[in-house]
Amino acid sequence: MTKYHFTSKDFNVFNVEGLEPRMVALIETTRPKLEALGEYFSSYLSQHTDETFYPHVAKHLRRKTNPPNDTWVAFSTNKRGYKMLPHFQIGLFDDHAFVLFGIIYESPEKERMAAKWQQQVNDILALDRDFIIKSDHMKKTYETVHSLDEDALKRYIDRLINVKKGELLFGKVFFPDDAALMSDKKFLAAVEDTFFKLLPLYI
């Protein structure tokens, strides 16, 4: 039984038409995996940071008409929520899974994290070639970190501070045919490796 890695059934959830039918498919197919990943990686992050991390599985409760285009589990040090804090995420759209760390527009800690990342520009640029950067967690679009020079990365960081809706996230994406999505063992190893390499941007 597939407990952790996403399969075509999970990606196909987002092809189901209508809010209620899609939510039924999501709850039956994908949410159990997000809950399992939440338990596994809240423990992993707690062990590697000496802080207690809590999982937050997306419920999509605010949606009244439009079905969700993605779903996720987020990890933060607050038991009640994650949006106000720097946090880690595992989730998927219809065409790729994502493993991310960053901060979104609701957080009052954007300036603190931007100052930290400004001191880590060289470390960020030295991430593996398949690491990505994105400035809107609700959109699929991203760039590879490898494609950026120092000035371009600094513009991303400056935007985090200077734009009210500014966000900044780093991580990896995995397409449905990616080797990491062929088994639970491979996916857990890929997520562990991604989080481990992102931890210096958090600690």
From Swiss-Prot:
Q: What is this protein called?
A: UPF0637 protein MCCL_0722
Q: Which InterPro entries match?
A: UPF0637, UPF0637_domain_sf
Q: Output the Pfam families linked to this UniProt entry.
A: DUF1054
Q: SUPFAM superfamilies this protein is in?
A: YktB/PF0168-like
Q: Which HAMAP family has this protein been placed in?
A: UPF0637
Similarity comment: family membership: Belongs to the UPF0637 family.
| Organism in which the protein naturally occurs | Macrococcus caseolyticus (strain JCSC5402)
